[in-house]
Amino acid sequence: MLCRALLLRAAGHRQSSSLPLQHLLDGYRCSREDDHLSYGEIGMPVPPFGCSFSAAPNFEHVLAVANEEGFVRLYDTEAQNTTKLISKEWQAHSNAVFDLAWVPGEHRIVTASGDQTAKVWDVRAGELLGICKGHQCSLKSVAFSRFEKAVFCTGGRDGNIMVWDTRCNKKDGFYRQVNQISGAHNVVDRQTPSKLRKKRQNLRGLAPLVDFQQSVTVVLLQDEHTLISAGAVDGVIKVWDLRKNYAAYRQDPVPSKSFFYPGTSTRKLGYSSLVLDSTGANLFANCTDDSIYMFNMTSLKTFPVAVFSGHQNSTFYIKSSISPDDQFLVSGSSDCNAYIWKVSEPSLPPRILVGHSQEVTSIAWCPSDFTKIATCSDDNTVRIWRLQHYPEEEKSVSNKAKLVGWVTQKKPEEQRGAGRSASPQSTPAKAFSVGSPCASSPRPAACAPSYSGDLPLSTNTPTVSLKTQMATACTPAKLSGASPRTSPKLVPSSKMSIKHWIARTPCSSPEVGKKTPSPRKALAEVTQSLLETSSTPKAQHSQAEKRAKRRLDCSKEDEAGQKCLQDCSCVTELDHVAKKSKLNLCHLAAGQRACDEGSLSLADLDNEHEDSTHSPKELSFPGSLVNPSGTQTPPPVLQSPCERDSDVVDKENSSPERKNWLSALGEKLRTGKAGSPPSSYTSSAKRQEAAVVTTSPKTAVNTSVSMRKICTYFHRKPQN
């Protein structure tokens, strides 16, 4: 009978030990009495940064919370009266307290602050026991070993890890580090060995290194000889042997073991939290790529054995904690919630603690009581979640009004899409109408990981709309009253010849219909005479021939005032000053008179347009020479505006129907012997003499234009 009773008792013990606890997670609630506001010196709300439960005997229910203004408060989670809820509070530092740790089994606590110091406090006596000084930047993490009460470690933004021993004597009233790991998580410098040697000699000295970009974010003591650390940028979890004096060596410290980043992100490589289970065999590393990696510390393999996902980690304030029975993992998140996973089944959807309105940062699971979880949030509150069991009718009627937090189940599809979901602080993607032919960019590739924490959001900007706007901006306005045939279609750039490119001036659109008048011709009246002129048979040209010319002005006054006096088909340029054009060869027969008549002012041209019988003024120069043709030739010192502005021969608007320019020059020389220049007159000067200039910005339409060689489009420099 005794043996049978023992067997039944053993079987019952096995059944009770294997009883799943996951169904109990849905019972966590946070009532209004457990929602506490974190405030500073003047009573203003400030965010809490760290929280931790005590492990001292008869003190396990005490929760220590540190906030941004350096205050530390002790909350009695078992107090029935709200007046006795805060057992003690004091301002530990004049700067923010980023982390705190209880001395194992003692009523002492160590705070790590932004004032570059760590302080040891006796919480019962309320006195300061010592100050640890040695860091050059803010302290981000502090940790004790479970087997040591006097030895602890700190990590800071200066990239250094320091080990402290409170049993050592104080120097100048401060505790000094007994071991130091400088540049523990420095990124490998890609400089030459000589530069590295000089840099190391300059920076390596008595003072620790300072590197804000290679901060030590978290430190952890596995035992009295093993330290684990992680950084902000290198993506490597390093294990250090404290029996080695790293301060005695001047070269970069080498860890005894390293766990390299196992994910696929290219820039989110930092770790915000490291947690060991009660056995010290499993390490949980909270990474900023929205994943928690589980490593086996007893194995020689360095890749993770499990990955927990579903939350969001966008800052280095997100912490994790393990349940007392090592079955569950809880973590804060940037999406205003806390998440609970089952360690043995990481693929299952996690439970969600819902209730905070801002990022949930530090979190602590009471090591002596499975039913209590503490969370800190950027909404300036500290909440204590308790495991409660109420009937369904009580949940919905009486207790829901008193609750500020509860547990929900994350859906499997939400967990799969958690990596692709954006942070609440990010701008959501724009939704476009169905059926719109748009291309969104960028998009993750098919081979991309399920999460995209390092990928930018897709803009969903319709590409077609952008192209349409660009095309609209480049298309000139249509002429009112113009017929469709007067506005030819645009010629594709792939089909355009060199004549099309020469015809296009900078910052101008292709020739479509009527061109806008030049800004220099602001006084000219824009009329519809161009359309009438272009419709006549005399002005009909092919599109290629029109594009072979430069842009011409097309006002009514231009056409009336620019007609050649010799009734030829010459064409002049738009602006003789800017383009330095010459008179057409047809003016050579008439001599310089045509140039003089064309050098009238704009008012004279307008008067000439109004009164066709008006005769142009003849310009005379003192000391001018009269050639046999009867025209006056100004001296070389005092030349007409036409000859001053003309430097090179303009062959672009010449017509093949006229004489050859050599024969015209010869005839000029034969008839102008009386006014011939000196014998030193060079051939280039002769070409300059034969050159003619446009005298008016007015233009006329050429009636016949033939294809010309490309060499004629380039001006020839005069030889002085």
From Swiss-Prot:
WD repeats lie at residues 43-85, 92-131, 134-174, 211-250, 266-305, 310-351, 355-395. GO terms for biological process: DNA damage response; DNA replication; mitotic G2 DNA damage checkpoint signaling; proteasome-mediated ubiquitin-dependent protein catabolic process; protein monoubiquitination; protein polyubiquitination; regulation of cell cycle; response to UV. Its main location: nucleus. Residues 528-542 have a biased composition (Polar residues). A motif (DDB1-binding motif) lies at residues 164-167, 240-243. Keywords: Biological rhythms, Chromosome, Cytoplasm, Cytoskeleton, DNA damage, DNA replication, Nucleus, Repeat, Ubl conjugation pathway, WD repeat. GO terms for molecular function: protein-macromolecule adaptor activity. It is found in: Nucleus; Cytoplasm, Cytoskeleton, Microtubule organizing center, Centrosome; Chromosome. One of its GO terms (cellular component) is centrosome. It holds the Pfam family WD40. Residues 543-552, 642-660 have a biased composition (Basic and acidic residues). InterPro entries: G-protein_beta_WD-40_rep, WD-repeat_CDT2_adapter, WD40/YVTN_repeat-like_dom_sf, WD40_repeat_CS, WD40_repeat_dom_sf, WD40_rpt. Component of the DCX(DTL) E3 ubiquitin ligase complex, at least composed of CUL4 (CUL4A or CUL4B), DDB1, DTL/CDT2 and RBX1. Substrate-specific adapter of a DCX (DDB1-CUL4-X-box) E3 ubiquitin-protein ligase complex required for cell cycle control, DNA damage response and translesion DNA synthesis. The DCX(DTL) complex, also named CRL4(CDT2) complex, mediates the polyubiquitination and subsequent degradation of CDT1, CDKN1A/p21(CIP1), KMT5A and SDE2. CDT1 degradation in response to DNA damage is necessary to ensure proper cell cycle regulation of DNA replication. CDKN1A/p21(CIP1) degradation during S phase or following UV irradiation is essential to control replication licensing. Belongs to the WD repeat cdt2 family. This is Denticleless protein homolog. The lineage of its organism: Eukaryota, Metazoa, Chordata, Craniata, Vertebrata.
